[in-house]
Amino acid sequence: MVSQEQYQGDIQQAEEKILLFLRTFEDIQENMHFGRIPEAQARLRDTIGDFFESAPSTLTILEPPEDLKEFHSAFSAALAHLNNSSTGFLEGVPGPNFGGAFVNSRFSLCRGLNVLYNQRAHLPTLRSYWLLPEAESTRDALEPQTDGVGVPVGMIHHPQTPEHADYSLYVPEYYTPDKTWPLIICLHGGYGRGDDYIWTWLRPAKSKGYLLLSPKSLGPTWSVLQPPVDSRSIRAMFDEVCETYSVDSSRVYLSGLSDGGTYAYLLGLDQAELFVGIAPIAGELSPAADGMLRQKQGIDVPIHVVHGVHDFIFPVEAVRSSNELLEHIGYQVKYTELPDWSHALTYSINETHVLPWFESLEPKAQA
């Protein structure tokens, strides 16, 4: 059996490879252009080399100290998930069916992230991945050693019930009920999941003290044609969270990606009393909103629309037109058009565009 120092040294080497993989793959996913898949695959392949092929045999040979056997098993499982993710992406055939390979790769990645996050106490090299750079100096304060608040904290996954779909919730590890906490509701894209999209928001939430509620749609995507179907589900989740945690009702925000952005318009205008602001990203203003627009429903809620010039799902010309319509009616619209972005995930977009805008808004006046 190797010494604990030797064992941790070998694990640290693996961590360094994993950190490089995670950062590279994140950048690829956020800047994905489906016309340039081979280039993205080549970049990822160059980054990881044969790490995932060799790591399992290395871990098998590496016998952990007794007190790290449970960690060793979890770490091995995380590597398997990351390997599945990498393999699925690299072996996906560019073309119309690549989207399915990408989604499955993403789900495997997030399963791996979940395991790594739960084992972060043993993985110091990876700790920087979970935080914004400016929060590094306060890292220890963001990870208290004791849990005395009486409610679950960290990354929590709730199953479906008759009242709501399944959802993922992040509660900062330093949560205390002695104060109220702002909440961001973030809606995944079509064929996505809550336990997938929540990871794009983890760094700012953990670093700055936000609760995250990331719902799963009841169907493969959001009920845009029948908005009440998913809105009832989301409201039930929201009420459940508010019953358990000390939520600042004057600072509840809504954002969504792609179909989630489309649904953010509908949910945000329909339940405007809940939200300080709504931020649809790479979505469209659906005709299902026509009735609400005619009645100027939710007209006092600021909207920040974020869209890429090269979006191939929802063309930017249509988004520009819908922004003009909203402004003509009297809605408060801020528009950020990203000249180099297409239609992809939103890590840095959440961190550099959406959250700063949320934080610029005045808290909602309480009745």
What are these regions (language model features)?
Residues 242-243, 250-299:
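Primarily recognizes the serine-hydrolase "nucleophile elbow" in alpha/beta-hydrolase
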Residues 173-179, 223-258:
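Gly/Ser-rich "nucleophile elbow"/oxyanion-hole loop immediately N-terminal to the catalytic nucleophile
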Residues 175-223, 287, 312:
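Short substrate-entry loop that stabilizes the transition state in hydrolases
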Residues 1-180, 366:
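A domain-start/cap signature at the N-terminus of enzymes
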Residues 217-219, 283, 338-340:
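Active-site loop/turn elements of alpha/beta-hydrolase fold enzymes
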Residues 306, 316-367:
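C-terminal catalytic histidine-bearing segment of alpha/beta-hydrolase fold enzymes
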Residues 299, 304-307, 311:
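Short beta-strand/loop motif that positions the catalytic acidic residue
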